[in-house]
Swiss-Prot record:
Disulfide bond positions: none
Main function: Catalyzes the NADPH-dependent rearrangement and reduction of 1-deoxy-D-xylulose-5-phosphate (DXP) to 2-C-methyl-D-erythritol 4-phosphate (MEP).
EC number: 1.1.1.267
Identification of the protein by name: 1-deoxy-D-xylulose 5-phosphate reductoisomerase
Cross-referenced Gene3D superfamilies: 1.10.1740.10, NAD(P)-binding Rossmann-like Domain
Keyword NADP: yes
GO BP: isopentenyl diphosphate biosynthetic process, methylerythritol 4-phosphate pathway involved in terpenoid biosynthetic process
Cofactor or coenzyme needed: Mg(2+); Mn(2+)
GO molecular function: 1-deoxy-D-xylulose-5-phosphate reductoisomerase activity; manganese ion binding; NADPH binding
Pfam families assigned: DXP_redisom_C (PF08436), DXP_reductoisom (PF02670), DXPR_C (PF13288)
Length: 381
């Protein structure tokens, strides 16, 4: 029996993780759940999965939940302290970091320090603190298994000596606006941007997929997860989202991992590794399908170029880029900035940052804090 703490249990990845638990009650058990403030959803989860601890970031929401589940034997905690409580208890074996944004960095670090393995769906953790997180995991002998479909695909293809690896190829759908003119992009609304052609995801990651910032974040994540230089990480536009990623070896051989665009598959693999479990999910059928690929250079994706540049520069710059992007995306969703302003804001904040070595958590969090304040200042004008 594997016992889980699920951070971000009410979000897209979190609810799909619980679906995997639901399918495998003899192998998986929920020890703790954590979310932001969705009291109604997490109460339903509490009554079904009977966790021992629930953490909510918002204190008011935690108080309400405590009243709602008073008939259950559940400890309700709040804030970052509560979030850390869910990951540092001795009972859970694996922490699923499905929480959105840089906020996942601290609980990931604390979970590693107390000996937990990580099923990582929170790419911002490695973007902001990749060297620190991976160094901690390596030093303590802990495993970080990727949940992102692209990185799970790469992980599944890396069966040989890593010294024979030539490069990795991340695929991207290109989002809903590939090939659109600047005039068309000026009219993009949050509702339109939230209509991803292939994947069902949360709001923030869906906007990131439209701008291609999500792929930029994944490039930085891949750099840390697989210890690859940035010039060994390629991106290909693959609109059908059937091939999730590829690896190329030194002899020219290419291995690709294929599957339906269903996040439950990489989630399950991260929870069952190194074995595989059967499931009732719909299978991939390639009959009649045409698979196409395009160079992202054929389109204007400034976010992808910015992410490569920030990743190569390193230090605190990726954390600043990520923080500025989080603020800008939420401002777009709140109709405070236009779609085309998102990456411009991020670029401006990055250009103003005095980069430091990201050697400790405090330095990273300070850079993150500065970037959020500066982005808000630019939005307010």
């Amino acid at each position: 029996m594997k016992r889980l703490t699920i951070l971000g249990s009410t979000g897209s990845i979190g609810t799909q993780t619980l679906d995997i638990v639901r399918q495998n009650p003899e192998q998986l058990e929920v020890f703790a759940l954590a979310a932001g403030k969705n009291v109604q959803e997490i109460e339903l989860q509490a009554r079904e999965f009977k966790p021992r601890i629930i953490g909510l970031m918002e204190e008011k929401a935690a108080r309400e939940l405590k009243q709602r589940v008073a008939d259950l034997d559940i400890e309700v905690v709040s804030g970052m302290e509560g979030l850390l409580r869910t990951v540092t208890d001795e009972v859970p074996d694996t922490v699923v970091t499905a929480i959105s944004g840089r906020i996942g960095l601290e609980p990931t670090m604390e979970a590693l320090k107390v000996g937990k393995d990580i099923a990582l769906a929170n790419k911002e953790t490695l973007v902001a603190g990749g060297d620190l997180v991976m160094g901690t995991a390596q030093r303590l002998g802990r495993t970080i298994l990727p949940v992102d479909s692209e990185h799970s695909a790469i992980f599944q293809c890396l069966e040989e000596d890593p010294r024979t690896l030539d490069k990795i190829i991340l695929t991207a759908s290109g989002g809903p606006f590939r090939g659109w003119s600047e005039e068309q992009l000026q009219e993009v609304t949050p509702e339109r941007a939230l209509q991803h052609p292939n994947w069902a995801m949360g709001a923030k990651i869906t906007i990131d997929s439209a701008t291609m910032m999500n792929k930029g974040l994944e490039v930085i994540e891949a750099h840390h997860l697989f210890h690859m230089e940035y010039d060994q990480i390629d991106v290909l536009i693959h609109p059908q989202s059937v091939i999730h990623s590829m690896v190329q070896y030194c002899d020219g051989s290419v291995l690709a991992q294929c599957g339906r665009p269903d996040m439950r598959l990489p989630i399950q693999y991260a929870l069952t590794y190194p074995t595989r479990w059967p499931n009732p999910f719909e299978r991939l059928d390639l009959r009649g399908k045409t698979l196409t690929f395009f160079d992202p250079e054929d389109y204007d994706f400034p976010a992808l170029k910015l992410a490569y540049a920030c990743g190569k520069r390193g230090g605190t710059l990726p954390a600043v880029m990520n923080a500025a992007n989080e603020v800008a995306v939420h401002a777009f969703l709140a109709r405070r900035v236009a779609y085309l302003e998102i990456i411009g804001l991020v670029d401006k904040v990055c250009s103003e940052h005095d980069v430091l070595d990201a050697t400790d958590l405090e330095t990273i969090l300070n850079a993150d804090h500065w970037a959020r304040i500066r982005t808000e200042e630019l939005i307010h004008g």
